Amino acid sequence: MSLKYLQNQKNLLYLMTIAMTLAFATWMVLLNNFVVERASFSGKEIGILQSIREIPGFLAFTTIFILLLIREQKFAYVSLVMLGIGVLITGFFPSALGLYLTTFVMSAGFHYFETVKQSLSLQWLSTQEAPEILGKLIALASFTSLITYFFIWVSQYYFSFSFESIYVVSGFICLISVSYTHLTLP
């Protein structure tokens, strides 16, 4: 199979979905234990953190203004880089302010990426194939989440990996995936 066969917009959507889901699922599944065990969060701080996580969702409309400056596909890459960096550095900031900042960066990347991914999907896919491919993207995200949860469980249960190392590996894989897709796909 030649690389040219793999270089299409659907595969770009698939790979970006995997990268996003891997990073976000890692962040979500480790967060509650990390903030309690390492940052000594109470319910109050967890509530503030979750509220901060939703702020970029409210600001997703600003995508329109950002797209006046850069192309959508490039913005998708930038958003995934923000997500990857936010996840990668989360473990190094076990304080309220540090976690609030890393959460905002991660969440901004996540919300902007999801907004742009939906837009790109609807532009790139024909009306006949859109329902099937969008369904496959959702299924791929679910499968990626399950695989991520399994590897996190194995890495902590059998190998005693720290929260920090898991966050770093997950964020790094996201960043490598973005680099790969940026360099090899349309």
Model-derived regions, located:
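Helix-loop boundary and gating motifs at the non-cytosolic
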Residues: N8-R53, G57
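Transmembrane alpha-helix termini and helix-breaking/packing motifs in multi-pass membrane transporters
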Residues: I64-L69, I147-S162
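C-terminal ends and interior cores of transmembrane alpha-helices
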Residues: V81-P94
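Helix-loop junctions at membrane interfaces in 12-TM secondary transporters
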Residues: F92-T102
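Intracellular juxtamembrane helix-capping segments at the cytosolic ends
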Residues: Y112-L125
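Glycine-rich segments within core transmembrane alpha-helices of 12-TM secondary carriers
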Residues: G135-F150
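Symmetry-related core transmembrane helices of the 12-TM Major Facilitator Superfamily/SLC fold
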Residues: S165-S179
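Conserved small/polar residues in nucleotide/adenosyl-binding loops
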Residues: T181-P186
